């Protein structure tokens, strides 16, 4: 059959674009779909149903395939049938066979539903959506094995009443609230063949109940007004919107269709189960329903008292890991009390799941062991990032390149004295000067010491007893003193607990320096002898801990430390073993301040320069010549203040900068220190709201000499340039000059 190049135009084909609704055929006619072109499907393909009809004159009720075949036989071109005729006949367009089916639906877990129904089933609704329990599960039978079905469910209001739970029963409380938007849940496996549906239990466990009206999940379909089941617009999604304190009835539907978009024009078979009726609540009202949920729902662990939730399981795993770590370290390091006491405290900060709870107690380890008050997300994140959380919570820090987890050599063990300072003797304002703290033992670049010499003297016998004391007395707030370790060899770390830097009970688990910023670059610590005065006061290890580098202040040699200490009139050993308040004096005499609050430099260098200039006259006074004979005389001059009060500065804020050339000229071998001080004008803010009961980090010039009034007059009399020069030359001053400067 040959077709002409130009197809003739048949009058009446334009009628195909006008809406025309014929009488409904027994199966279903799709002419309305082709004529209306609904908004949800602007380019609807020809339907697979064989009952679809085009709006050609005289062929309104003919199936589309019959029209195409008849047109080919009569010689009518395909283009004359309208634009839809150009569409290729797909397999889904073929008419389905007429199948007789009789679906039957059986509710799963009917006995459990009956138990809930007798007591009045309650379902919790939340903003984010809550799944149903018992879940809605059915088993289907009687379906055609080859035909495709769509299975879905919706929840409708059982009545027009609002309820309240009163006197252990539900009673009507008024008229129902306005109905929520209609929402249906289509099973995610739809469409599927009848054989697939009948081979398994159909569960709607992913359906969620919510009271969030603004929920936008899903899509919307428009149902015709003459639909047997639904009319109007319905949205399809995973969440159904309900009103609290209203009674609802779930419904189950079976639709024989192979496309979800055909739902508005398909026949629904609806099934109701009265035992699935429930009342939507925001919190369980009936205790019997709550108990039923606990007894039957394996996920209802928020109400349990037996401790089967995730938090309880984490605690059990933590206790189990404690025993495993104890046994492992006993095998590696022997069964002696000494090795076990060393390992117990190291494991406390080695891993988040280590014997932290059994060693120190949960009162001081809230950052390491998840408590009941924590949320699951926080506890899980701490478990997932165990090493990072461990390192951030460490109070004992090192500058070694070697990992802190190396458990092989006992010399690399960082010991935490958890209960070294009980509360009765831990107050700084009540203890005597000689019994307040043991001298701080700080070792810097001590390569010649052996493992036994580097061990702290307090470690041998007191740690187990103190740990037991802290465990037996949970009311006591144990302090966690700072342990500063440095060594340039990065192989064996010296041990030096610094009790004067102990944190308060609330800060026991926090990081070194308590989060205060320190605007010092590690490159400023890389110059040898730059901070020799700090090393003289025992500050070399502290700066090395701040820099975090293995080549920083730990590179300070012994000669620089010894020479600076000799200039102060102290030996190298006494400079490192001074009590903490005397170390503050030595630091302040060099223009530096060491704050017990956790910050190193709590005010700018200009303030420190002024303080050092004022105290340079007393740098070699009798206080420094006899450091241990004047303890009682010096103690009343120490100021107790929770705030950092800056030392008064003479006029001219650029005091250090203007005098820099003269300082560089007169510095000589000390120009490295001057340049380092001038090049890094750091200003660190101290937490003024801190409740630490310790002395202020600011030491005025009057606390450096025996006569504060004379020193104040001396400071006012001297000029700024002379003060700076005296700072530089004070270390090399002769004894007779220092005697004339002191009263």
Swiss-Prot record:
One of its GO terms (molecular function) is sequence-specific DNA binding. Residues 544-695 are annotated as: Transcription repression. Residues 324-334, 379-388, 418-437 have a biased composition (Basic and acidic residues). GO terms for biological process: animal organ morphogenesis; anterior/posterior axis specification, embryo; atrioventricular bundle cell differentiation; atrioventricular canal development; atrioventricular canal morphogenesis; blood vessel development; branching involved in mammary gland duct morphogenesis; cardiac epithelial to mesenchymal transition. Residues 107-220, 241-305 bind DNA. PANTHER family: T-BOX PROTEIN-RELATED (PTHR11267), T-BOX TRANSCRIPTION FACTOR TBX3 (PTHR11267:SF91). This is T-box transcription factor TBX3. It comes from Homo sapiens. The gene is TBX3.
């Amino acid at each position: 059959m040959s077709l002409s190049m130009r197809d003739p135009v048949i009058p009446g084909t334009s009628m195909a674009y006008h809406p025309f609704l014929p009488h409904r055929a027994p199966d279903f006619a799709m002419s309305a779909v082709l004529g209306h072109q609904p908004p949800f499907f602007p380019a609807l393909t020809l339907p697979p149903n064989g009952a679809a009809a085009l709006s050609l004159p005289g062929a309104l009720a003919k199936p589309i395939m019959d029209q195409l075949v008849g047109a080919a036989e009569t010689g009518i071109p395909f283009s004359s049938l309208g634009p839809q005729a150009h569409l290729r006949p797909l397999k889904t367009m073929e008419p389905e066979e007429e199948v007789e089916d009789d679906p039957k639906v059986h509710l799963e877990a009917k006995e459990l539903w009956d138990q809930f129904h007798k007591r009045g089933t309650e379902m919790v609704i939340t903003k984010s959506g809550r799944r149903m329990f018992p879940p809605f599960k059915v088993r289907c039978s009687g379906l055609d094995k080859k035909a495709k079905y769509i299975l879905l469910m919706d929840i409708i209001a059982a009545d027009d009443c609002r309820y309240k739970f009163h006197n252990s029963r539900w009673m009507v409380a008024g008229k129902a609230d306005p109905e929520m938007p209609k929402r249906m849940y289509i099973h995610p496996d739809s469409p599927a063949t009848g054989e697939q549906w009948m081979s398994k239990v159909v569960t709607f466990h992913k359906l969620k109940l919510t009271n969030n009206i603004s929920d936008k999940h899903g899509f919307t379909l428009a149902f015709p007004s003459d639909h047997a089941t639904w009319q109007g617009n319905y949205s399809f999604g995973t969440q159904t919107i309900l009103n609290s304190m209203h009674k609802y009835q779930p419904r189950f539907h079976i639709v024989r269709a192979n496309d979800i978009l055909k739902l508005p024009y398909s026949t629904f078979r609806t099934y109701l189960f009265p035992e699935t009726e429930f009342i939507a609540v925001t919190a369980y009202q009936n205790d019997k329903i709550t108990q039923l949920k606990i007894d039957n729902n394996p996920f209802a662990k928020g109400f349990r008292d037996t401790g089967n939730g995730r938090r309880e399981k984490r605690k059990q795993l933590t206790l189990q890991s404690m025993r495993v770590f104890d046994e492992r370290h006993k095998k590696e390091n022997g069964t002696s009390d000494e090795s076990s006491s060393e390992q117990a405290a190291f494991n406390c900060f080695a891993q988040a799941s280590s014997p932290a709870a059994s060693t120190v107690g949960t009162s001081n380890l809230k950052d390491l062991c998840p408590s009941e008050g924590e949320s699951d997300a926080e506890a899980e994140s701490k478990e997932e990032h165990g090493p990072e959380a461990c390192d951030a919570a460490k109070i004992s820090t090192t500058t070694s390149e070697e990992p802190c987890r190396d458990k092989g050599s006992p010399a690399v063990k960082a010991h935490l004295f958890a209960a070294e300072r009980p509360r009765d003797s831990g107050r700084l304002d009540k203890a005597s000067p000689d019994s307040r703290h043991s001298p701080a033992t700080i070792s810097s670049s001590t390569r010649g010491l052996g493992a036994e010499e580097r061990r702290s003297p307090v470690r041998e016998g007191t740690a187990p007893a103190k740990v037991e004391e802290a465990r037996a007395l949970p009311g006591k707030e144990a302090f966690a003193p700072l342990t500063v370790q440095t060594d340039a060899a990065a192989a064996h770390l010296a041990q030096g607990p610094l009790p004067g830097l102990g944190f308060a009970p609330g800060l026991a688990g926090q990081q070194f320096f308590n989060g205060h910023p320190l605007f010092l670059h590690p490159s400023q610590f890389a110059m040898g002898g730059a901070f020799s005065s700090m090393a003289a006061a025992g500050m070399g290890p502290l700066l090395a801990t701040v820099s975090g580098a293995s080549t920083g202040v730990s590179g300070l040699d012994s000669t620089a430390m010894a020479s600076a200490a000799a200039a102060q009139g102290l030996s190298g050993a006494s400079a490192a073993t001074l009590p903490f308040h005397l170390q503050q004096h030595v630091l302040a005499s060099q223009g530096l301040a060491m704050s017990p609050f956790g910050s190193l430099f709590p005010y700018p260098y200009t303030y420190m320069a002024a303080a050092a200039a004022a105290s340079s006259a007393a740098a070699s006074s009798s206080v420094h010549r006899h450091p241990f004979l004047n303890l009682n005389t010096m103690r009343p001059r120490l100021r107790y203040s929770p705030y950092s009060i800056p030392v008064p500065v003479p006029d001219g804020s650029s005091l250090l900068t203007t005098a820099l050339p003269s300082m560089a000229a007169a510095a000589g071998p000390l120009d490295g220190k001057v340049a380092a001080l001038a090049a890094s004008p750091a200003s660190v803010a101290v937490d003024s709201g801190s409740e630490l009961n310790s002395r202020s980090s600011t030491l005025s010039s009057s606390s450096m000499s025996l006569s504060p009034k004379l020193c104040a007059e001396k400071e006012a009399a001297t000029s700024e340039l002379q003060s700076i020069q005296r700072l530089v030359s004070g270390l090399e001053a002769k004894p007779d000059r220092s005697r004339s400067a002191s009263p």
